[in-house]
């Protein structure tokens, strides 16, 4: 018998896909002078943080823990999952804040809780806003009801 726990490892991909589908169109409407591209602007690749293409929305899946373990322990029934999102721009801090607010609204639509309110940082005309989002995701949960 094959145990299918692959869903746990697909969560980050699904979240990035949802962000591309729902945040990018809103970002394009609100920031006409910036270039937002599906598949490029939102990334989970840490290597993209050096020599950053602006704007960049970096989505990092933090350690998650298994929840709802059964007696046999063969399947993963749920995970407590946390994501850190860094928005990096080269325009101004207020742009980073506004972009993160739009991204946060998509996370809230996916029923995530904001566990670390945005923190802000800047150095040499590069502005960063960071927040963390967490939720319990069960094996048969849908991240987004469309």
Residue ranges and their predicted role:
Residues 1-70:
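Small/polar-rich, solvent-exposed N-terminal microdomains that initiate assembly or binding
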Residues 94-128:
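Short, compact, well-ordered microdomains
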Residues 1-21, 64-72, 76-80, 114-146:
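Short, charged interaction patches at domain edges and termini
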Residues 56-96, 100, 113-116:
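Short, conserved turn/kink motifs that form compact alpha/beta structural patches or helix kinks used as
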Residues 15, 19, 36, 57-59, ...:
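Hydrophobic beta-strand residues in large extracellular and virion-surface proteins
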